[in-house]
Structures are given as structure tokens and as C-alpha cells.
Amino acid sequence: MSYHINSSQNRFHKIITTEQLNQVIEAITDGRYSWACVLILRFVGYNPLHFIPQRTYSRLMKDNRQVANIPGSLNNGKSISANSPITNSSVVNKASTQDLNQSNNSDYLTTPEPDKRGNIPGYLETKMAVMYSRNQ
């Protein structure tokens, strides 16, 4: 007896790009689960307001926009001490102007962190790479 997998899985891989998937994974590894849900809904073409309350959506948008509002002088190569009022992750997550110009939707602002790859288990990272290399 064989089981036929619905073709919606193939469409899923064409809807969400590798870059978008990385943004969702980054949000999850940062503990921002609600933001990850908003990103997924947007990437597959749904309006997040049809699924979550307006107040929650507004708060998520505000929180994730503040990441990009950090002054540029803070991210000029100087290290920030642990006692600094601005957390290190907020500085690292600051999106550059170039990233914003390339983005189709400027409502989300994230930049991949080089050290965040350590939070994704190696076996998961390998499987994701294999999965996307087959479907593209």
C-alpha cells in the first residue's frame, strides 16, 4: 500500500524562499514565536490580521521596527559592554539600509547573525539544505 503526498508540499517550497525561511528560523531561535507566525502568514500570502488581534499585531510591528531604529553610531565596529542599556542582540539585529532597499516588504527588519547558526542543530541545518536544494 502506498501513500500519495499532496502536491501542496511542493507549492510550499516555491512560496517561501530560503531567505524567508531563515528569517522565520531566526525569529524562532530568538524566542519571538509570535513574530515568526506573522512572518509565515505574510510569506504564504495571508493577512496576519485575519488570524491575530489588531493590538497584538500592532505590538509585534512596533517591537520589530524598534530593532532598526538603533542609531548607526552604535554599530560602527565598537564593542558594547554587557552593562550597556542596549542589548547586544538588538544591535546585531539592526537591519542595514541596503537590506531595506532590497526587501519587498519593509514591515519586517531582520539581519542574519553569524553566531546564530550555533543555535540551529546541525542535523536540522543539513536536512533543510538538502530539502531546499532538491526543490529549487
UniProtKB/Swiss-Prot annotation:
Residues 94-120 are annotated as: Disordered. Induction: Transcription is up-regulated by 6 hours after nitrogen stepdown, and remains high for at least 24 hours. One of its GO terms (biological process) is heterocyst development. Keywords: Heterocyst. InterPro entries: HetP-like. Transmembrane segments: none annotated. The keyword Protein biosynthesis does not apply. Residues 94-109 have a biased composition (Polar residues). The N-terminus (residues 1-68) complements a hetP deletion for heterocyst formation but only partially restores nitrogenase activity; it partially bypasses the requirement for heterocyst differentiation master regulator hetR. In Nostoc filaments, approximately every 10th vegetative cell terminally differentiates into a heterocyst specialized for nitrogen fixation under nitrogen deficiency. In bacterial two-hybrid assays interacts robustly with HetR and Alr3234 and weakly with itself, HetP and Asl1930. NCBIfam families: HetP_family. Delays heterocyst differentiation and commitment when nitrogen is limiting. Interplay between the 4 HetP paralogs controls the timing of commitment to heterocyst formation and its duration. Epistatic analysis show that the 3 paralogs act upstream of hetP to delay commitment (asl1930, alr3234) or inhibit development (alr2902). Asl1930 and Alr3234 must also attenuate the activity of Alr2902. When only this homolog is present no heterocysts are formed, showing it inhibits development. Ectopic expression partially complements a hetP deletion. This is HetP-like commitment protein Alr2902. It comes from Nostoc sp. (strain PCC 7120 / SAG 25.82 / UTEX 2576).
